[in-house]
């Protein structure tokens, strides 16, 4: 599906037509530049690769510099592929936030905030051991039993335990588009989207 790369600016709120205060996320969507056009004959599938945010040549590897020079564009910091654009695009074309003028809902892909090593209560919503009497101590937020004894004599794969939380690729579907501001490349989306302020997100129609 067609889309754009963008940067999460932060959250604010706007008033709807009936006077309700609606929380929304402000995203700087594009402008993105077409850096490669893939075809079924050459690449096995049809897609358009776009780049977002300029970066210096000295921070770009030589293979990527050749890739950008072939497209006739300046080096880009972030690249992503999209399919099924309605209009035919050429190398070097610019795609702006006006792509979403007729979109009522979008999907947003981002990287969730990293929270470090967390226990089972925060990471998986466990209730803890529960009782703090009958000899229990220092067990309020522990997972409890993680398996049987002599059989199967192991912990099964996939057992929910403490570990690294956050920093995952998260997709939020069907978020309502509240407003498109082309002159500032801004997109206002109802509710929250994954990631922290300044993080890169993918917006798909």
From Swiss-Prot:
The keyword Ribosomal protein applies. Keywords: Ribonucleoprotein, Ribosomal protein, RNA-binding, rRNA-binding. One of its GO terms (cellular component) is cytosolic large ribosomal subunit. It comes from the Bacteria. One of its GO terms (biological process) is translation. GO terms for molecular function: rRNA binding; structural constituent of ribosome. Part of the 50S ribosomal subunit. Forms a cluster with proteins L14 and L19. This is Large ribosomal subunit protein uL3.
């Amino acid at each position: 599906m067609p889309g754009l790369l963008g940067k999460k600016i932060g959250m604010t709120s706007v008033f709807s037509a009936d006077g309700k205060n609606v929380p929304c996320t402000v995203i700087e969507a594009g402008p993105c530049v077409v850096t490669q056009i893939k075809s079924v004959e050459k690449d096995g599938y049809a897609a358009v690769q776009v780049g977002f945010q300029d970066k210096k040549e000295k921070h770009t590897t030589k293979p990527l510099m050749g890739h950008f020079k072939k497209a006739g564009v300046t080096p880009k910091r972030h690249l992503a592929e999209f399919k099924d654009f309605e209009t035919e695009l050429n190398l070097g074309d610019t795609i702006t936030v006006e792509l979403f003028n007729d979109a009522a809902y979008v999907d947003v892909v981002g990287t969730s905030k990293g929270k470090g090593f967390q226990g089972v209560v925060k990471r998986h919503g466990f209730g803890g051991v529960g009782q703090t009497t009958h000899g229990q101590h220092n067990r309020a937020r522990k997972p409890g039993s993680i398996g049987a004894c002599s059989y199967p004599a192991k912990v099964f794969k996939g057992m929910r335990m403490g570990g690294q939380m956050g920093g995952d690729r998260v997709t939020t579907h069907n978020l309502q588009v509240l407003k498109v501001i082309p002159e500032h490349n801004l997109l206002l989306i109802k509710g929250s989207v994954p990631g922290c302020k300044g993080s890169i997100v993918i917006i798909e129609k």
